[in-house]
A protein has these predicted regions:
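Active-site beta->alpha loop and helix N-cap motifs at the rims of alpha/beta catalytic domains
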Residues: 2-156
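Catalytic alpha/beta core domains of metabolic enzymes, predominantly
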Residues: 137-142, 149-204
């Protein structure tokens, strides 16, 4: 089954609803379980999800080779067949593999990519500088999601840091907020959007 050549639509700040974070099915021998992948996608679509997010932290992307990542994305996109947007985790140990994966999945029909900060970042300025490099790596035409999940990354992104990233990143159209407690952070970000200090984004 071949995935569509272009996404049905690129991700944008109007995205809303349930973007389910999927697992990556494996066989008992540790290989990708593509039959189970198809069943998983069918179940998600039948349940009415607005979109899918694959190869995230819960999707165990770090356990896959580059070849396996491409194969899994191709399988999911082929099964979805443009019915909902699919966001692909593109976090990588370096910018070259991030660029390669992003270019590949966008060509296959992904709606955008998701990026989390690496655990090596220690200061606010390092975090902001890293995402400036993300912007340069992905380019202006690839919509991307900022993943804020300090429990797994070990990187605490404060509200001012996130706002700096958003101000510097016109292609960042969504925040995947997984910090806890996080109500104050979300309230401050929403207030900044309302005041026009940053461009509107979708928050999931």
């Amino acid at each position: 089954m071949q995935p569509p050549k272009q996404p049905m639509n690129k991700l944008d700040a109007s995205a809303q609803g349930v973007y389910l974070i999927t697992v990556t099915p494996f066989t008992d021998s540790g290989d990708l379980d593509l039959a189970s992948t198809d069943r998983m996608v069918d179940f998600c679509l039948d349940s009415g999800v607005a979109g899918l997010t694959i190869l995230g932290i819960m999707g165990e992307a770090t356990k896959l080779t580059a070849q396996e990542s491409h194969l899994f994305v191709k399988q999911v996109l082929g099964r979805v067949a443009g019915r909902v947007p699919v966001v692909v985790g593109a976090s990588a140990p370096g910018f070259a593999p991030m660029r390669e994966l992003t270019q590949s999945v966008m060509a296959m029909g992904a709606a955008g990519v998701m990026v989390a900060p690496p655990s090596t970042l220690r200061t606010d300025d390092q975090i902001v500088a890293y995402f400036e490099m993300v912007n340069e790596t992905l380019g202006p035409d690839v919509p991307w999601v900022l993943q804020d999940h300090p429990v797994s990354t070990g990187v605490q992104m404060s509200t001012p840091v996130i706002l700096r990233i958003l101000m510097n990143s016109p292609a960042c159209v969504m925040l995947k907020h997984e910090d806890c407690p996080g109500l104050a952070k979300l309230s401050a970000i929403c207030a900044a959007i309302k005041q026009g200090n940053v461009m509107p984004i979708s928050i999931l």
